[in-house]
């Protein structure tokens, strides 16, 4: 006897189902971001995220199979926002001097960190999964590139003395992060922190009379 088999068709989500899943995923990320800003990575458990989002814990795992994967998504989301903010603040060549554009980067980063200290500490230094540590390197490179582009433009136009833009940029990123980590962790950022960072930045760039800029 001949049997005729009809191959099964692969399941395809309808646009409506996909839209609901996308909306739920977005709500999970926003809930997790809220917890991250309040309690850091330590308080951003899958169960807590589910409660904040108003869904079952299993639904969170549907979108993010592990806390590490959720943490990486959060890190990328926050970093994307921060890099966009400092890039906008830095402006474009011709909008202010090169030194002013570099200073705008460090000022914007520091001021945003002070407005959300718990989130900034999580971004910069909170002990987390190795996967997030790897993302931190990407984050530092992204900020370095923003700095380096402005430094290179200043060197090219003669506004800044000759220097290695990538090296200067890396030093500024490292110094800025290190200067903020301790105060953010202790909740004791003084009013002179940002002005001191600006002065340091101008000196690092080789700007004459940096103390009076």
Segments (PLM) and residue ranges:
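Helix-turn-helix
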Residues: 27, 35-69, 73
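Hydrophobic alpha-helical connector segments
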Residues: 73, 84-115, 168-172, 194-198
């Amino acid at each position: 006897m001949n049997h005729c088999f009809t191959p099964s068709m692969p399941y395809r989500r309808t646009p409506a189902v996909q839209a609901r899943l996308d909306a739920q995923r977005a709500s999970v990320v926003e809930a997790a971001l809220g917890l991250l800003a309040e309690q850091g990575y330590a308080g951003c458990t899958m169960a807590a995220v589910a409660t904040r989002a108003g869904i079952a814990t299993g639904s969170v795992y549907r979108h993010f199979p592990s806390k590490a994967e959720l943490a990486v998504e959060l890190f990328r989301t926050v970093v994307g926002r921060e890099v966009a903010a400092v890039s906008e603040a830095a402006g474009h060549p011709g909008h202010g001097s090169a030194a002013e554009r570099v200073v705008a980067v460090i000022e914007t980063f520091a001021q945003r960190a002070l407005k959300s200290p718990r989130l900034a500490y999580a971004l910069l230094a909170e002990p987390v999964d190795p996967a997030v540590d790897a993302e931190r390197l990407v984050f530092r490179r992204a900020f370095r590139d923003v700095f380096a582009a402005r430094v290179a433009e200043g060197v090219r136009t003669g506004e800044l003395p000759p220097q290695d833009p990538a090296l200067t940029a890396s030093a500024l990123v490292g110094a800025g992060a290190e200067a903020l980590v301790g105060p953010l962790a202790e909740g004791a950022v003084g009013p002179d922190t940002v002005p001191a960072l600006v002065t340091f930045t101008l000196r690092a760039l080789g700007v004459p009379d940096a103390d009076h800029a």
